[in-house]
Amino acid sequence: MTLPLDLLDMPFARLGDRLGNPLRLLMVHAHPDDETTTTGATAALYAAETIDVYLVTCTRGERGEILDPEAQRVVDDAADGEQALGELRVRELAGAVTMLGIKGSRFLGGAGRWWDSGMAGEESNTDPRSLVAGDFQEQVDALAAAIREIRPQVLVTYDSRGGYGHPDHIRAHQLSLAAVDRAAETGGESESGGEGGGEGAEAWSVAKVYAAVVPFSILRSVARRLGSNGDSPFAPLAEALANGVPEDLIEIPYGVPDHLVTAQIDARDWLDAKTAAMRSHRSQMAADSWFFKLAASSDGGFGIEHFQLLRGTAGPLDDGFEADLFAGVRAVDDSDCEPDFGWLPEEEPAGGELF
């Protein structure tokens, strides 16, 4: 069997960590579509590199905004509209996961265990089924069990503000950090009374935890591009910038200051995969919306995704940023990790081309 030249040029060190474990990335998101809009290009990049990418979604997004007329009709005709929307979004997520090459996807505690809490201040925040009203330790134990099973070196979630302040995003941040700590503990029962790491699961220490973030400079760029007209939430920012208000005097309620960004993943070659996954989330993504058009454009910046290191040690930097979430974790030379070509086909396809 003849290996393609680009594979032969790939250093064996990219196949595992320094202990010989296969590289694995776990993303913890709040609702279906979050995995795509915030980390889709990065997920597709690592999946294409044959790194195992896993996803835990905390809710089915039962209370998300509906932007597709057909989806709205389905919900309106259902006896329980929120339940119907949740079931629809489960199917949409399955399509997006396929487009991004994600190896394993699950819902925290199982689909429907915890519900979308709605936006901050809404009555649904106190619904006993909602994520933010649920038992925190039970949620931590469920995620810790997933961490011990998957054994990722890198976990990606949100920052302490949840990106834009959604209660479920903030909760996902909180329980992710707590679950990382819980998963690293050896033995004992969980604080919620069960087996915290899954029956028979060994403790696992996640090497690096990141928050997916959007720097203020990107938000300003998007605002200037979209202008103050239309339905974009950036209209007030665009108007302030157009009126000459100094940037440091404009309060931006979402995103992070640029100096907090520690990693920048250039995944523009996988923007098509991200866009395809966005199309799968039809109920949430109107194809004629400003957001979809901007995300799908090659110069919209959505193929470069940004992260803030919350736990762990940064690896080597490239122009001031980590260019790889596994920097400092990957095996450093051929002797650290034996290559495994078991995923390659035994026979070459007709024509002599492997792919």
Swiss-Prot record:
EC class name: hydrolase
Reaction catalyzed: 1D-myo-inositol 2-acetamido-2-deoxy-alpha-D-glucopyranoside + H2O = 1D-myo-inositol 2-amino-2-deoxy-alpha-D-glucopyranoside + acetate
Annotated disulfide bonds: none
Binding residues annotated for Zn(2+), in chain numbering: H31, D34, H169
Gene3D superfamilies cross-referenced by the UniProt entry: LmbE-like
Alphabetic keyword roster: Hydrolase, Metal-binding, Zinc
Molecular function terms, GO-annotated: N-acetylglucosaminylinositol deacetylase activity; zinc ion binding
Cofactor section: Zn(2+)
Record note on cofactor: Binds 1 zinc ion per subunit.
Catalytic activity, EC: 3.5.1.103
A GO biological process held by the record: mycothiol biosynthetic process
Record's keyword annotation contains Metal-binding: yes
PANTHER family: 1D-MYO-INOSITOL 2-ACETAMIDO-2-DEOXY-ALPHA-D-GLUCOPYRANOSIDE DEACETYLASE (PTHR12993:SF26), N-ACETYLGLUCOSAMINYL-PHOSPHATIDYLINOSITOL DE-N-ACETYLASE-RELATED (PTHR12993)
Family listed: Belongs to the MshB deacetylase family.
NCBIfam families: mycothiol_MshB
Reported function: Catalyzes the deacetylation of 1D-myo-inositol 2-acetamido-2-deoxy-alpha-D-glucopyranoside (GlcNAc-Ins) in the mycothiol biosynthesis pathway.
Name the UniProt record assigns to this protein: 1D-myo-inositol 2-acetamido-2-deoxy-alpha-D-glucopyranoside deacetylase 3
